[in-house]
Amino acid sequence: MRQAEVTRDTLETRITARVDLDGSGKAAFATGVPFLDHMLDQIARHGAFDLDIRAEGDTHIDDHHTVEDVGITLGQAFARALGDKRGIRRYGHAYVPLDEALSRVVVDFSGRPGLHYFVSYTRARIGSFDVDLAREFFQGFVNHAGVTLHIDSLRGDNAHHQCETIFKAFGRALRMAAERDERAAGAIPSTKGAL
């Protein structure tokens, strides 16, 4: 069973993330940041992962710590659920459009954290959500899941559409990379023999 539950408890946040990599897209979120909940739902539904994330944070200051720490905790949960990564595809990619917006996401469960984020949003906020926090979410995930992640917003006039295509593509790319590869069942997907 490729499942994990991780709790992160700091002076800034308390977060619990549950993930089932072989789920069906069931989702439950209560992070205190409504737009983040909406984006997490994209990951669950387009990745076909069952995700349950609960967070309490110092949102009276701003949403930064909560958004970043949700990324950290979700990354830890993915790393734990994947274990030694034996038998997975390892690489995943997706292009996702939403009206005028188009984004590309490529992921490698390499064990080497690296975020390559090329997004120029058309405005600084989506409702009350600071678009800079999307990068903080992905940086937290990358550092704690041990993945190399390339995110490119190829076009878009609407910042909400840009962000949503990124999170949808991220879910689809994760799904592809985390899928079991029946042709390489039981093998570590690396010539090194370890990831």
UniProtKB/Swiss-Prot annotation:
It is an enzyme of class 4 (lyase). Transmembrane segments: none annotated. NCBIfam families: PRK00951.1-1 (NF002106), PRK00951.1-5 (NF002109), PRK00951.2-1 (NF002111), PRK00951.2-4 (NF002114). It is found in: Cytoplasm. It comes from Aromatoleum aromaticum (strain DSM 19018 / LMG 30748 / EbN1) (Azoarcus sp. (strain EbN1)). The gene is hisB. Belongs to the imidazoleglycerol-phosphate dehydratase family. GO terms for molecular function: imidazoleglycerol-phosphate dehydratase activity. The keyword Amino-acid biosynthesis applies. InterPro entries: IGPD_sf, ImidazoleglycerolP_deHydtase, ImidazoleglycerP_deHydtase_CS, Ribosomal_Su5_D2-typ_SF. GO terms for biological process: L-histidine biosynthetic process. This is Imidazoleglycerol-phosphate dehydratase. The lineage of its organism: Bacteria, Pseudomonadati, Pseudomonadota, Betaproteobacteria, Rhodocyclales. HAMAP family: HisB. Its EC number is 4.2.1.19. Keywords: Amino-acid biosynthesis, Cytoplasm, Histidine biosynthesis, Lyase. It catalyses: D-erythro-1-(imidazol-4-yl)glycerol 3-phosphate = 3-(imidazol-4-yl)-2-oxopropyl phosphate + H2O. Its main location: cytoplasm. It comes from the Bacteria. GO terms for cellular component: cytoplasm. Pathway: Amino-acid biosynthesis; L-histidine biosynthesis; L-histidine from 5-phospho-alpha-D-ribose 1-diphosphate: step 6/9.
